[in-house]
Design a protein with these regions (language model features):
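Alpha-helical, largely C-terminal catalytic domains
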Residues: 18-201
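Cysteine-centered motifs
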Residues: 9-11
């Protein structure tokens, strides 16, 4: 069971973890390096479809998605602390695997690669924290809780916003239409669908 008090509380029960040994500090440093590597991982969908410089990175996407998650979760009355953690973690495995698009690999193979990568990254953290982060990340992958379902929709909403950003920079709508279509198809939350509809007008 995940370590939040109950469904109505956004608080976690963890005692402070002090890094008393040099090897622990080195492990944390290794974790931070993986986080930083996301700045150099381009979002593969843009890379394949658009011929432009300075493509959005996975780190760019994760930050925007996290801010959107914080606001929209508060508006929906969900567990915002959990969804913010989930948003920060949801693409972390891509620091090792790269951004794998759904049509480039079988779904089970993609899940397996990302599962292995996430465990490799999290092994640098104290055990209880690593276990919690993996469970939150896995909750997103399974997509059965309210927070995970909302975040999947936000992930696509952020993609649509980024596509519109590129359109405003001069990229033709025709080149971006597949991204708008995907967002329209996969965003399930009605409030987010309204945001998307208003945004696209």
């Amino acid at each position: 069971e995940l370590p939040w008090h109950n469904g109505n509380c956004n608080c976690y029960e963890f005692k402070p973890v002090f890094l008393k040994h040099l090897e622990h500090n080195k492990m944390i440093e290794n974790f931070f390096k993986k986080v930083l590597e996301l700045k150099n991982v381009p979002r593969q969908g843009w890379k394949e479809k658009l011929e432009i410089d300075n493509l959005e990175s996975v780190a760019d996407h994760s930050y925007s998605t996290t801010v959107m998650s914080m606001i929209l979760s508060d508006m929906e009355g969900l567990n915002t602390e959990k969804i913010v953690r989930m948003a920060l973690l949801h693409d972390l495995a891509e620091s090792i695997t790269g951004d794998i698009t759904p049509d480039s690999i079988r779904k089970n193979e993609k899940i397996n690669k990302e599962n292995i990568a996430m465990k490799q990254i999290l092994k640098n953290l104290p055990n209880k924290i690593a276990e919690m982060y993996f469970e939150i990340w896995n909750e997103y992958q399974k997509n059965f809780t309210e927070e995970a379902i909302l975040l999947h929709s936000i992930d696509k909403l952020e993609m649509a916003f980024q596509a519109k950003f590129y359109q405003n920079k001069g990229i033709s709508k025709e080149k971006l239409q597949t991204f708008f279509n995907t967002a329209n198809k996969e965003i399930k939350n009605e409030n987010l669908r309204k945001i998307l509809s208003n945004f696209m007008e």
